[in-house]
Amino acid sequence: VSFSSVVEEIRKNVEAYRSEPRTLTYLALNENPYPFPEELVRECFERIDASRLPTYVDSPSEEFLNELVDYVSIGGWKAQKEQISVGNGADEIIYVLLSMFKDLSIYVFPPTYSCYEIFASAVGVKLNRVPLAGERIDLERLKDLNEDCVVFLPNPNNPTGHLFTDEEIFRLLNSGALLVLDEAYYEFSGRTYAPLIEDYSNLIVVRTFSKAFGLASQRIGYLIANTALIDAYNRIRLPYNVSYTGQLFATVALKNRRIFEERIERIVEERERLKSALRRLGFNVSDSKANFVFVYLDQKEAERIHRALLERGITVRKTGWGLRISVGQTQQNDLVIETLEGLM
C-alpha cells in the first residue's frame, strides 16, 4: 500500500460534502435568517483581549462552561461541568464519536442527516441503515440492538423535522445501545432528553450554536453525557478545538438569550405559516418542529420544483425524499409561497 493508493481510495469511496449554490434567497442550510444582533457584536469586540490572541485558550473556557451548565440545566435537573464538553461545531463531535466507536455496529434511520454517511465513510465505518417506516422507527427490525451498537438519531429529524416519540426514544435507550441524540434543532421544538443522562449511561446529547443562536460561522457545538463518556471524549478530541472568539460570541449569546428566544418564537410562527400555506397548495408537508419545513416529493417533481425555485433566485435543499426549505424572514417565505403557487 502506498500513500498515492490511499489518496485514490479516498477519492473513489469517500463522498465529498456539497452544499447548494448560493443565491439571493438562500434557504438550503437551515441557517438562522436573522443577523447576529449588532449590539452583541459590539459587546464581543469590546471584550476581546488582545493578549489572549497569541495564546492557546482552554476549550471550553471556565466562563463559557459555566454559561453552558446554566443553559443546559432544565426543570429540576442541574447539569454538572463534568457532564459537558465542546466541539468545533456539532459536526466535529459527530466525527469524533464515529471515530471512537468505529468498531461497533452503527445504525442510522434514513432519511436522516447526510453527514452521518459522509463522516462514516471518511473514518472507514460501515453504517447499518434501517429506513424509517413513514416517520416512525421500525423497531421490529431492531430487536438485536445491544451494547455493541451505536445509534445516531436527529431529534427533530433532519431532513423531515418531525419529532420521534417517547416510546421510540426509550425503546432505543432500554436496548442498551449507545444513543447519540442529535438535538441540533432543540430550541425550535422545546423537547430535550438531556436530563436522562442521570439514568442512562448510554445517552449522548449533541447540540449546536449554529441554528438558534445564528453562529454557524463560529463553529460551536457541545455534548452532554455522563462523566465517563465526557472524559473519554475529551481524551480523543483535539485540544483547543474551539476558538477564543467563537467561545466569546457563544458566551455573550447565552448571557443575552432572551433576544434569541424572541427570534425563535418568530421563526416558529413563520414555520407554522409556511407549513399551512404549502398544505393549502396540496403539498404533503411533514409536521416539522425544527427551523425548516419538508415537502415529500418524488424525484422528478422535486427536480422540477427545485429548478423553478432556482430560476427565481431561491435555493432549497433537494434530497432523495423531497425538498427541505429553511424558514426565512417573512418576505423570503412569502416569495417561496408565491413561487410555488405559480407552479401549481
Which residues does each predicted region cover?
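PLP-dependent aminotransferase class I/II
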Residues: 36-37, 202-279, 283-286
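PLP-dependent enzyme catalytic core of the Aspartate aminotransferase-like
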Residues: 70, 167, 307-344
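Short acidic capping loops at alpha-helix termini that bridge into adjacent secondary structure
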Residues: 79-84, 183, 201-202
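Conserved PLP-binding catalytic core of the aspartate aminotransferase-like
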Residues: 268, 280-312, 327
